[in-house]
């Protein structure tokens, strides 16, 4: 049995099937000679050429890439303490003992064969003596089994435990140093989770290298050394010859190993393109549906999968040939040694047992060396990872100063004196150049300027996130470099537009690591107008927030951030565009809290909207890193300089004059060559920049520039508006009607994870508190990925939330009850039935050879004992020739098995992926709103679940056929030779099977618990890194470390149980293997002793069952794998079989030739599928005539964007109808319907491709002239033409970065090119700054000109200058409707919403 595991049961380590390869390799849809079985028979030229080409590419890559830096192996254990060294020494001794046990068994196996051979003596006394000897040997094997149990247990337990202990120290040190780094580190390496993923992956590599891999290496080296010793002790000549053939076997495996690992890396890269296409399509599903590009996405995905064909086929080819030659050479080597062995038997220099022991001891020794060598890859990876981590651990911060001075009292006088500054990640770009600024104590100074003026860099310098390149930053006359860093930051309160919340309670987030009583925290919350909404929560201040808890609206986050600053009671206050992402009502509430906070404090305000800082004590105007103007609002207006220009530009976006614009549909040569910066002090890009040094005008207290120009440079730390806009407690996310997104630097947008609901009582129901109440009353809610709308909870809910959840859960449970049948899986692979037949033939042949080889070897050994002279030579020569022929056939059988089953699996994986992706794109938008169907989750399903289908069928079918034939042939041989011993072997089968299954299930269960703990620990770190600026500003690093160490301690406590459990399971399973072999031996001895079988029969049957034992167990050992992947299999067919609630492909639906554009929402009730308890629209009715432009305004969460979602038919109403030209939308073909609508979203979706492809995404057959005309109409042609590659410029990942305004103009050009009769605009300019907003507004004005039906969602007055009607929403109902003048006369909600645009004289203004 042990022999079979070493030679024919285990795959050599370098030839183990590469799971990652199968997970990414994708055969193409189109025919290929690689997939044609007949193509291979035509010659090997194509294959050889492909291999040669692949090898050449890999060599080129190796030449270009220098070897990575690594630490010495001994340094991996730098964090080990005395207890760790004890664990490693004990574990090493146990590993060596465990590795030696198999070879020791072989030594006794030789004795068993000798005893069996001599037990044929007729002497009764000698026969009894031999029987007693066999019983003793059986007991010896039992003792070996006990030793294996103990040593295996100790080996695994010690190495797992010490690995967890040492890596816990490494993690702790890494995180400690990471949190103390200056911000330039995060600018260089990113702070979006990459650092966290690096530490997680690197620590796992180090843990593997210094724990179980070391134990495995010692184990296998012990097998190697002891194998040589036993081999040479038994028969040194046979051992030496066997050793001489080893390099050929190793070479066969080594060559294939090189190709396999290189091809595995290449195929991962090849699949990355397909994965990117799928992720984009799913992430931007609304845009994809709006432009009806499902077919394009499916075609692109299927085409990109073709790239993996070459590598997938090569992998199957290399795997088949590599395994074939490795096994073939091993079998041929065995034939050679047995043939040579007859000479030593004939000469009396060795007996059969010694030859067998020497032969297999050396073979197992060689395999042990191979397995030991495979650990070097893990050692190298661990050393490389350790270099990266240890380099970080020894890195010192350039701004750390814990030994600096502490001022006795702080007045709050701040001065920037001749400051020069550049970000370390972009040293060639000057941000500040000779900057001077003085902030008097207890005064508020607002910094304004264009993008790239450097204003956003002032706060990081004040917080000492960075140090100036030249110059000084002074606090009360003292250079802040000389001050103790932690003390300095404790004097500064920071409130940002994007406040950070750790995954803690609200109480802990407000305290943020400081010792504060609950009364103090509540008082701070009251001052921040946050106490009321916190108290309304079920758990109040103990409510968990952050990624692992309750989701907060942006307004609520800002209030908590203000409360945090209030509790700090700082002398200096830094406000970084705090209200930039809020709507006007929410802005008013937050501004009141900020006004209280600013009293008596030195304050620096970074502002984008100039209307908010008119009351500041001083306003500092910046341009190109210098201070060019400074004074009060009135002084700067009178000056007529840059501030006046910026204010004029901002006001132009509020009350723009109507510009005569021709209908572009009437003129094919319409030109829009207007200056995009007109009226804003922005020069034409083609104009030369004339920059003169600003001069200080004495006497007026004002800086005046001699000449100004536009600086297009942006600071690395962009402070973009938050993606969520919030109102007061009675209001909610402005993007509650929309899809919450996180903007990334690669121009992609990633949907936020699922956000649970926040229920807050309506203002009418609130108790009296310090917070002002909102005049509106929708509930605060937040929703995950879809266009959420938030409304108050109506008294007539459609269904009970509990009932809904219960029903949903029951439905899912019902779906999970039934697993896909074997025949369902077989149907997927039916097109590859020929490959399956050829692969099955190879698997059957190779599986049968396992017991047949044991049978023939047993016959040779028998001849050693019973034959003499010429008869011995003839018999041994005959059987050795048969063994050699079996070796040759093994090469062919392995090639057939692995090559053709590999092709079958690759095509099956590709087909399943295409089916899944196609099925995903059939589903309605509501399906994607479910947290289980997030873009990341669905992308992972495409990448992994399809390979699980392959693994559950193709790969496992191959093994099952192989092992089944081994079992069948072994049982047939056993039953024919002696049924008694066969029954004993069958009786041990359930024991071995249950042992294997229990071991795998046990290990999986404990590993899952440890992995979950590591995941929770990583969340703590990831939260801190993502919010590193806030963590550092509030000196919360110690709090983060405390939380992280608590998680590590939990992991260590669990690892003790984890290591002991795994060690016990492993050792016990090994014990059963040896013990069952001992039982089989005892029964063999008993059968021979009592005359039930002859000598030759006993030796033959014992060896057959010994060789076949592993094959008997392995098919049953697959059960845990199948059970583990059951959910993945079900997931595949759940997606494929799902029937969408909104059918997109109903060819019988209406496709009328003309669209007049009349839209009506009639008595509509609507709630989002994931939030059925929240009624967003209630009995809602709205009628829009064809060609009419209607603006929809309202507070956050009133249901504005939901209207667009219903018109696009992303969702169907719960009650009522949505009509187009008098017909229900449900009657129209869905793709036809969407093809007649043009959608412009607040956050423009820009795909990672060229500008050209982004524009023609709307119409792929558009000509060059049509595309450029659309860009001109969208005011995009000018900036596109100025780019080096023009329309072929690649944007997004690995391309240029565009401003939000430029992205929006490209998105508008896309809609212009579509030329749809219905235009839907969803707050398209709300997140764009004033400079770009006017240019975008002009493009939108042009877009809606002509006979088009337009629905306009807006909260800016500039968006409503061309509208025919204005509809005001609140709580899912229309509360006001009419023109601007009529609504202004009512002095209602519309007036309150628009008042920040016009001031108190709103009713006197008219929109012309």
Swiss-Prot record:
Localization, UniProt: Membrane
Gene Ontology MF annotations: ABC-type transporter activity; ATP binding; ATP hydrolysis activity
Residue positions binding ATP 1: 449-456
Stretches that traverse the bilayer: 86-106, 141-161, 214-233, 238-260, 312-332, 353-373, 841-861, 881-901, 959-979, 983-1003, 1062-1082, 1103-1123
Keyword terms, alphabetized: ATP-binding, Glycoprotein, Membrane, Nucleotide-binding, Repeat, Transmembrane, Transmembrane helix, Transport
InterPro entries: AAA+_ATPase (IPR003593), ABC1_TM_dom (IPR011527), ABC1_TM_sf (IPR036640), ABC_transporter-like_ATP-bd (IPR003439), P-loop_NTPase (IPR027417), Type_1_exporter (IPR039421)
Tissues in which the UniProt entry reports expression: Expressed in aerial tissues.
A Gene Ontology term for the protein's cellular component: membrane
Membrane topology: Multi-pass membrane protein
Residues in ABC transmembrane type-1 domain copies: 88-381, 836-1124
Region (Disordered): 14-49, 676-735, 752-816
UniProt domain ABC transporter: residue ranges: 414-649, 1159-1396
Amino acid composition bias (Polar residues), ranges on this chain: 762-771
Binding, ATP 2: 1194-1201
Principal subcellular localisation of the protein: membrane
Glycan attachment points: 120, 293, 451, 768, 1179, 1261, 1347
Chemical reaction(s) catalysed: (indol-3-yl)acetate(in) + ATP + H2O = (indol-3-yl)acetate(out) + ADP + phosphate + H(+)
Keyword ATP-binding: yes
Biased composition (Low complexity): 20-39
Ranges of biased composition (kind: Basic and acidic residues): 802-816
Phenotype seen when the gene is deleted: The abcb6 abcb20 double mutant exhibits compact rosettes that twist laterally and bow, showing increased leaf down curling and wrinkling, along with twisted inflorescence stems, twisted siliques, lateral organ separation defects, reduced internode lengths, and fewer secondary inflorescences. In abcb6 abcb20 double mutant, roots are short and twisted. All torsion phenotypes are associated with reduced auxin levels and reversed by auxin efflux inhibition with 1-naphthylphthalamic acid (NPA).
Signal peptide: none
Alphabetized Pfam families for the sequence: ABC_membrane (PF00664), ABC_tran (PF00005)
Functional description taken from the UniProt entry: Probable auxin efflux transporter that contributes, together with ABCB6 and in a FKBP42/TWD1-dependent manner, to the regulation of leaf position and morphology, internode distribution, roots development, and inflorescence organization, probably by modulating auxin repartition.
Protein name: ABC transporter B family member 20
Biological source species: Arabidopsis thaliana
Taxonomic lineage from the root: Eukaryota, Viridiplantae, Streptophyta, Embryophyta, Tracheophyta
């Amino acid at each position: 049995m042990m022999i079979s595991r070493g030679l024919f049961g285990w795959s050599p380590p370098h030839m183990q099937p590469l799971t990652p390869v199968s997970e990414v390799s994708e055969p193409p849809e189109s025919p290929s000679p690689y997939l044609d079985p007949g193509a291979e028979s035509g010659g090997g030229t194509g294959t050889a050429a492909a291999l040669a080409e692949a090898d050449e590419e890999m060599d080129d890559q190796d030449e270009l890439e220098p070897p990575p830096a690594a630490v010495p192996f001994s340094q991996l254990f730098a964090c080990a303490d005395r207890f760790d060294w004890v664990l490693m020494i004990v574990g090493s001794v146990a590993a060596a003992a465990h590795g030696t046990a198999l070879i020791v068994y072989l030594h006794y196996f030789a004795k068993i064969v000798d005893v069996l051979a001599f037990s044929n003596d007729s002497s009764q006394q000698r026969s009894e003596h031999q029987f007693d000897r066999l019983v003793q040997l059986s007991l010896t094997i039992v003792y070996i089994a006990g030793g294996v149990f103990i040593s295996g247990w100790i080996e695994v337990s010690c190495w797992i435990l010490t690995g967890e202990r040492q890596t816990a120290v490494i993690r702790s040190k890494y995180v400690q140093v990471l949190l103390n780094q200056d911000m330039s580190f995060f600018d260089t390496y990113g702070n979006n989770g990459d650092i966290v993923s690096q530490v997680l992956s690197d620590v796992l590599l180090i843990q593997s290298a210094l724990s179980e891999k070391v134990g495995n290496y010692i184990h296998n080296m012990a097998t190697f050394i002891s194998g040589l010793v036993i081999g040479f002790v038994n028969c040194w000549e046979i051992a030496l010859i066997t050793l001489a053939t080893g390099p050929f076997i190793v070479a066969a495996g080594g060559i294939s190993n090189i190709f396999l690992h290189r091809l595995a890396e290449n195929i991962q890269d090849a699949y990355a393109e397909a994965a990117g296409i799928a992720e984009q399509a799913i992430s931007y599903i609304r845009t994809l549906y709006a432009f009806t590009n499902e077919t394009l996405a499916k075609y692109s995905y299927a085409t990109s999968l073709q790239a993996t064909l070459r590598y997938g086929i090569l992998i199957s080819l290399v795997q088949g040939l590599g395994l074939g030659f490795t096994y073939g050479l091993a079998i041929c080597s065995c034939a050679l040694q047995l043939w040579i062995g007859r000479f030593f038997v004939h000469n009396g220099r060795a007996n059969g047992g010694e030859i067998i022991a020497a032969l297999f001891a050396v073979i197992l020794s060689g395999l042990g060396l191979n397995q030991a060598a495979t650990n070097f890859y893990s050692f190298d990876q661990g050393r490389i990872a350790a270099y990266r981590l240890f380099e970080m651990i020894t890195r010192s911060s350039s701004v750390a100063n814990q030994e600096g001075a502490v001022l006795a009292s702080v007045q709050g006088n701040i001065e920037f004196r001749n400051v020069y500054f550049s970000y370390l990640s972009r040293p060639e770009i000057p941000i500040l150049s000779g900057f001077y600024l003085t902030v008097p104590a207890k005064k508020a100074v607002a910094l304004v300027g264009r993008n790239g003026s450097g204003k956003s860099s002032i706060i990081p310098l004040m917080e000492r996130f960075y140090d100036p390149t030249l110059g000084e930053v002074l606090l009360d006359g003292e250079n802040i470099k000389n001050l103790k860093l932690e003390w300095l930051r404790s004097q500064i309160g920071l409130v940002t537009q994007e406040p950070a919340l750790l995954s803690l309670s609200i109480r802990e987030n407000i305290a943020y690591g400081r010792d504060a009583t609950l009364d103090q925290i509540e008082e701070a919350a009251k001052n921040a107008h946050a106490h009321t909404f916190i108290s309304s929560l079920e758990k109040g201040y103990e409510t968990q927030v952050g990624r692992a808890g309750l989701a907060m609206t942006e307004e609520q986050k800002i209030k908590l951030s203000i409360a945090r600053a209030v509790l700090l009671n700082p002398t200096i206050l830094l406000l970084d565009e705090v209200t930039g992402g809020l709507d006007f009502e929410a802005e008013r509430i937050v501004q009141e809290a900020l006004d209280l906070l600013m009293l008596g404090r030195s304050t620096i305000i970074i502002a984008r909207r100039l209307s908010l800082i008119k009351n500041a004590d001083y306003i500092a105007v910046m341009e190109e890193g210098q201070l060019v103007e400074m004074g009060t609002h009135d002084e700067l207006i009178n000056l007529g300089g840059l501030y006046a220009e910026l204010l004029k530009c901002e006001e132009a976006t509020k009350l723009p004059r109507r510009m005569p614009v021709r209908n572009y549909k009437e003129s094919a040569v319409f030109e829009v060559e207007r200056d995009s910066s007109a009226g804003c002090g922005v020069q034409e890009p083609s104009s030369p920049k004339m920059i003169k040094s600003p001069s200080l005008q004495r006497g007026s207290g004002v800086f005046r520039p001699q000449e100004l120009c536009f600086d297009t440079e942006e600071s690395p730390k962009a402070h973009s508006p938050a993606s969520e806009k919030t109102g007061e407690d009675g209001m909610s996310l402005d993007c509650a009607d929309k899809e919450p997104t996180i903007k990334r630097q690669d121009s992609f947008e990633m949907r936020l994870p699922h956000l649970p609901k926040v229920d807050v009582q309506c203002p009418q129901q609130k108790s009296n508190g310090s917070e002002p109440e909102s005049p509106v009353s929708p509930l605060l809610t937040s929703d995950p990925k879809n266009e959420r709308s938030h409304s108050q909870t109506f008294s007539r809910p459609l269904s009970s939330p509990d009932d809904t959840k219960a029903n949903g859960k029951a439905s899912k449970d019902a779906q999970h009850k039934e697993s896909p049948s074997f025949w369902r899986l077989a149907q997927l692979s039916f097109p590859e039935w020929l490959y399956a037949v050829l692969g099955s033939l190879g698997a059957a042949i190779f599986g049968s050879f396992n017991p047949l080889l044991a049978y023939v070897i047993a016959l040779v050994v028998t001849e050693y004992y019973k034959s003499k002279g010429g008869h011995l030579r003839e018999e041994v020569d005959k059987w050795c020739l048969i063994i050699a022929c079996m070796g040759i056939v093994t090469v062919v059988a392995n090639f057939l098995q692995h090559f053709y089953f590999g092709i079958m699996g690759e095509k099956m994986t590709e087909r399943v992926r295409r089916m899944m992706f196609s099925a995903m794109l059939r589903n309605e938008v509501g399906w994607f709103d479910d947290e289980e169907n997030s873009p990341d989750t669905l992308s992972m399903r495409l990448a992994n679940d399809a390979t699980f289908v392959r693994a559950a069928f193709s790969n496992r079918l191959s093994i099952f056929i192989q092992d089944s034939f081994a079992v069948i042939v072994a049982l047939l041989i056993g039953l024919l030779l002696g049924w008694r011993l066969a029954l004993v072997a069958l009786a041990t089968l359930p024991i071995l099977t249950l042992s294997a299954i229990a071991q795998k299930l046990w290990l999986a269960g404990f590993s899952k618990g440890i992995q979950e703990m590591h995941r929770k620990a990583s969340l703590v770190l990831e939260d801190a890194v993502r919010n590193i600026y806030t963590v550092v500003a509030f000196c919360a690093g110690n709090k983060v470390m405390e939380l992280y160490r608590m998680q590590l301690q939990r992991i260590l406590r669990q690892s003790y149980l984890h290591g002991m459990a795994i060690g016990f399971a492993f050792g016990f399973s090994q014990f059963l293997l040896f013990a069952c072999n001992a039982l089989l031996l005892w029964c063999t001895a008993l059968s021979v002793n009592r005359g039930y079988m002859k000598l030759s029969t006993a030796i033959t049957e014992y060896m057959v069952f010994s060789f076949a034992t592993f094959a008997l167990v392995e098919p049953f050992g697959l059960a845990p794998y199948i059970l583990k992947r059951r959910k993945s299999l079900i997931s595949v067919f759940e997606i494929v079989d799902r029937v969408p609630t909104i059918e997109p492909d109903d060819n019988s639906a209406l496709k009328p030739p003309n669209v007049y554009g009349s839209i009506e929402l009639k008595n509509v009730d609507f709630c989002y599928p994931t939030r059925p308890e929240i009624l967003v629209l209630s009995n809602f009715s709205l009628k829009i005539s064809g060609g009419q432009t209607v603006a929809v305004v309202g507070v956050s969460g009133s249901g504005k964007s939901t209207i667009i979602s219903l018109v696009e038919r992303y969702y169907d109403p719960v009650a009522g109808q949505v009509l187009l030209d008098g017909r229900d939308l449900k009657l129209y073909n869905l793709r036809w319907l969407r093809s007649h609508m043009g959608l412009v979203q607040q956050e423009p979706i820009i795909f990672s491709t060229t500008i050209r492809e982004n524009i023609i995404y709307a119409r792929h057959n558009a000509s060059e002239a049509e595309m450029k005309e659309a860009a001109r109409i969208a005011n995009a042609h000018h900036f596109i033409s100025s780019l080096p590659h023009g329309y072929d410029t690649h944007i997004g990942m690995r391309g240029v970065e565009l401003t939000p305004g430029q992205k929006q103009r490209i998105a508008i050009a896309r809609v212009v090119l579509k030329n749809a009769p219905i235009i839907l605009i969803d707050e398209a300019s709300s997140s764009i700054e004033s400079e770009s907003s006017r240019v975008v507004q002009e493009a939108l004005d042009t877009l809606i000109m002509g006979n088009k039906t337009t629905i306009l969602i807006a909260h800016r007055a500039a968006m409503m200058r061309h509208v025919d009607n204005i509809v005001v929403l609140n709580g899912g109902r229309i509360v006001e409707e009419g023109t601007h003048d009529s609504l202004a006369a009512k002095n209602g909600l519309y007036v309150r919403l628009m008042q920040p645009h016009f001031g108190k004289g709103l009713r006197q203004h008219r929109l012309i």
